[in-house]
Amino acid sequence: LVKWEAGDPEVRALWAMMNNWVYAGFDETYRKMGVGFDKIYYESDTYLEGKEKVMEGLEKGFFYRKEDNSVWADLTAEGLDHKLLLRGDGTSVYMTQDIGTAKLRFQDYPINKMIYVVGNEQNYHFQVLSILLDKLGFEWGKGLVHFSYGMVELPEGKMKSREGTVVDADDLMEAMIETAKETSAELGKLDGLTQEEADNIARIVGLGALKYFILKVDARKNMTFNPKESIDFNGNTGPFIQYTYARVQSVL
């Protein structure tokens, strides 16, 4: 990280190559889900803004420096603890980057409230970010809103990367499409259709089942995603709603 922030050519080249792989994967996954963004902020473009604001806060006495040269915020008056903002070697942390990103977002889109949609394991992080932004003079700091959501688990239990029980989003979507195709075929809903039509219906039903099963649960709660249950053409499921809509359209 020290070499990266110092602009080391070799480290930056390796970083750029790896990032391109990651971004290409993100783009493909979002494309399959039908998701798009008006603007994307990269931490690599915002961390300097964050470091600048942290140093301003240090000069104004909002923050303090430890003997190891690291910079911290004392939030005990707010009922919290001490928060690291810059490491002793001068490199940034997530909070530094989020401060910089928030500043740029405000500059690009003058607002009075900023909304973050991030998992509930980051509740504390955004509580701290709101306080820090307010201390740094951003009037909308206290208006920061964190719309948290729970984690998605499988019937077999919680997904854990170290145990290899994590399901890739692309693999899950493909599995849902295949399950939708099999279920639709068993029920005779693909009879008389071309292969292209059948594949398109399976994609619409499969992804609809996945999205609806997740959306029907209170976003703040953890949930267990059951692929077989979600693809059912009866009950409170995406396929049932889609099927009902199609039937109503045929009547109209």
Identify what each model region corresponds to.
Residues 1-252:
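NTP-dependent nucleotidyl-transfer catalytic core
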